[in-house]
Amino acid sequence: MANKALILLAVLFCAQAVLGVTIISKSEWGGRSATSKTSLANYLSYAVIHHTAGNYCSTKAACITQLQNIQAYHMDSLGWADIGYNFLIGGDGNVYEGRGWNVMGAHATNWNSKSIGISFLGNYNTNTLTSAQITAAKGLLSDAVSRGQIVSGYILYGHRQVGSTECPGTNIWNEIRTWSNWKA
């Protein structure tokens, strides 16, 4: 039985390494618990990309500060149940858990129930994506497919395609339009 557990752990570790995704849990970054949660279906057809339009962070410590500030704003000022996004990606190349898997976000009106929301920390009208961020985002999307959160033929949108906004910023917009699942 112990051998089976070790094999399972090794498989999970290798799967994470193959996808190149390290997800920093909400508890690890000091996030608050959601006041409520709505389940999100599996095999969704869409992923929506955002930017937070705030400060850029390039270290784990700085990204944690940004995450805590964004969550406080979303919960305390906007009255939302939690941080709006399912996942966020810092300039340090880490993926940070927001609402996480299988929980409906509050990131794109009329699209929350049919998409996952992924946001980059920073303002990408002025900031530029690093190769680590691009790798993390693509790895996270691959992970979402392998987990059954989104279908393999999912459609990738920038927030501006589903709402009246500049989000996800010009620099992210120009990048994601080159990705295979992006649709005009």
Swiss-Prot record:
Domain of life: Eukaryota
Keyword Plastid: no
Entry binding sites for Zn(2+): 50, 159, 167
Cystine bridges: 57-63
Its EC number(s): 3.5.1.28
One of the GO BP terms on file: innate immune response
UniProt keyword list: Disulfide bond, Hydrolase, Immunity, Innate immunity, Metal-binding, Secreted, Signal, Zinc
Induction field: Strongly up-regulated by PGN from B.subtilis. Regulated by both imd/Relish and Toll pathways.
Cofactor: Zn(2+)
Tissue spec: Constitutively expressed at high level in gut, in addition to the induced expression in fat body.
Cellular compartment(s): Secreted
GO molecular function, one term: peptidoglycan binding
Family according to the record: Belongs to the N-acetylmuramoyl-L-alanine amidase 2 family.
Function text: N-acetylmuramyl-L-alanine amidase involved in innate immunity by degrading bacterial peptidoglycans (PGN). Probably plays a scavenger role by digesting biologically active PGN into biologically inactive fragments. Has no direct bacteriolytic activity.
Name of the protein this chain belongs to: Peptidoglycan-recognition protein SC2
Organism: Drosophila melanogaster
Classification lineage: Eukaryota, Metazoa, Ecdysozoa, Arthropoda, Hexapoda
Gene: PGRP-SC2
